[in-house]
Amino acid sequence: MIFVYALLALVITFVLVPVLIPTLKRMKFGQSIREEGPQSHMKKTGTPTMGGLTFLLSIVITSLVAIIFVDQANPIILLLFVTIGFGLIGFIDDYIIVVKKNNQGLTSKQKFLAQIGIAIIFFVLSNVFHLVNFSTSIHIPFTNVAIPLSFAYVIFIVFWQVGFSNAVNLTDGLDGLATGLSIIGFTMYAIMSFVLGETAIGIFCIIMLFALLGFLPYNINPAKVFMGDTGSLALGGIFATISIMLNQELSLIFIGLVFVIETLSVMLQVASFKLTGKRIFKMSPIHHHFELIGWSEWKVVTVFWAVGLISGLIGLWIGVH
């Protein structure tokens, strides 16, 4: 059945994208490009966005099929809730930007509060209503040490889900970058899940992986469609949730290392400019810095994918030992 889920997720996305692209163009759901960004990006103005709807719909449909046939499907139900929750936040943000012609979208406060709400509901469903059982301790790799947090673990969940949701969002600035890194990440978590005996989570990772594989051909350079916040916020939230449910939270630092680096580059850039008036990078997130020093977009993407693959394998090794 795993092969069936994989094929279904792949086919649904691959078929939906070319159907959605002309619809988005007709409705003028095009991406606005920052004028201060690399000039090579200006030609992308008007490229359809909100393409994340395709793979999210594929994930929802395939997961609902899996829930019928999978024993102990509660983890899939919970992951589906997070997918829809963070995806909905991203969709509203994209809608305001594209339809209402407000480049700011949701305010940072609105987005943050909505993300916190999803994280708290996830904690309540899992640890209060016991939809799934996972530890409320953070496990330190290569040791038998676990830091117990009890109900304070909800604070960690909020930090982890909100942090990685926004990290993937920041990374989604080059054609295929976030999609490719997510494919690598879900591959690692699929393997880890099956090794750890978490079959339902493994099946969900397979669904994620193949849904994104169906999207990638349309998203690599030159991209015919962008995933938008609809896709990127959902992907980051799902990554954080999977690491939590596997009790392998810190593995995500390696499996999502490029997302972490991208986020840190923005934080360092802002802090440096506020404190010294000088910028560390030519532009942040750091993928734009490499473009501005002369790297082609495709070179940046492939190098970052390679870094993601190597660090992902390290994260996988940490998770299964």
From Swiss-Prot:
Its cofactor is Mg(2+). One of its GO terms (biological process) is cell wall macromolecule biosynthetic process. Keywords: Cell cycle, Cell division, Cell membrane, Cell shape, Cell wall biogenesis/degradation, Magnesium, Membrane, Metal-binding, Peptidoglycan synthesis, Transferase, Transmembrane, Transmembrane helix. Its main location: membrane. It catalyses: UDP-N-acetyl-alpha-D-muramoyl-L-alanyl-gamma-D-glutamyl-L-lysyl-D-alanyl-D-alanine + di-trans,octa-cis-undecaprenyl phosphate = Mur2Ac(oyl-L-Ala-gamma-D-Glu-L-Lys-D-Ala-D-Ala)-di-trans,octa-cis-undecaprenyl diphosphate + UMP. Pathway: Cell wall biogenesis; peptidoglycan biosynthesis. It is found in: Cell membrane. Residues 22-52, 92-111, 166-176, 217-232, 269-300 are cytoplasmic. One of its GO terms (molecular function) is phosphotransferase activity, for other substituted phosphate groups. Pfam families: Glycos_transf_4. It is a multi-pass membrane protein. The keyword Cell cycle applies. The keyword Cell wall biogenesis/degradation applies. Residues 70-75, 134-150, 198-202, 247-249, 321 are extracellular. GO terms for cellular component: plasma membrane. Its EC number is 2.7.8.13. The chain crosses the membrane at residues 1-21, 53-69, 76-91, 112-133, 151-165, 177-197, 203-216, 233-246, 250-268, 301-320. HAMAP family: MraY. Catalyzes the initial step of the lipid cycle reactions in the biosynthesis of the cell wall peptidoglycan: transfers peptidoglycan precursor phospho-MurNAc-pentapeptide from UDP-MurNAc-pentapeptide onto the lipid carrier undecaprenyl phosphate, yielding undecaprenyl-pyrophosphoryl-MurNAc-pentapeptide, known as lipid I. Belongs to the glycosyltransferase 4 family. MraY subfamily. This is Phospho-N-acetylmuramoyl-pentapeptide-transferase. It comes from Staphylococcus aureus (strain NCTC 8325 / PS 47).
